[in-house]
Amino acid sequence: MVTDEDTDTTKVVEQPPVKPPVEYSAWMQLRPRIARELLDLATAGSLPTGAALKRVCRRLFGPDCSPHDETRFLIFAAPIARKIAIGLADRGDRIGDSDVKVQDLVEWLGWLDRFDPMCATMIDLHYFAGLTAKQTAAALRLSPEVVIRDLRFAKAWLQTKLI
């Protein structure tokens, strides 16, 4: 006899928590799952990106995920969240109330990824993972003043490129 317990689809969909990886190659193996779960949450539109990242982290590593492991997860997953958020936006759309188009942001972030990856990581953590400047500084083991300075520089640089 088949019971509801035997046909429960959540057992198939949900995967048990995994141990946060140490090796970069192990993180890369998790990348498709992280991207899929972030995309599902983004298309549902129910959560800000930072909250979605934290939810995926808890799904992956369980409720007992340490702050250290969550930080490592955010450093790895924030660029994925950025690409998904920008990918879902219309290239002609503007960012907030500004004159900045999504396409301009895509080009600028691509440049930043190549020429100042640390600043790009700061932007990912601050704007896409929702961390404060202090939290971003702690995650990257930098002083808050350095993070604030670099975020201000990035914003000013973007404004000069778009004038």
Predicted regions and their residues:
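Intrinsic, short, N-terminal disordered tails of RNA polymerase sigma-factor systems
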Residues: 1-163
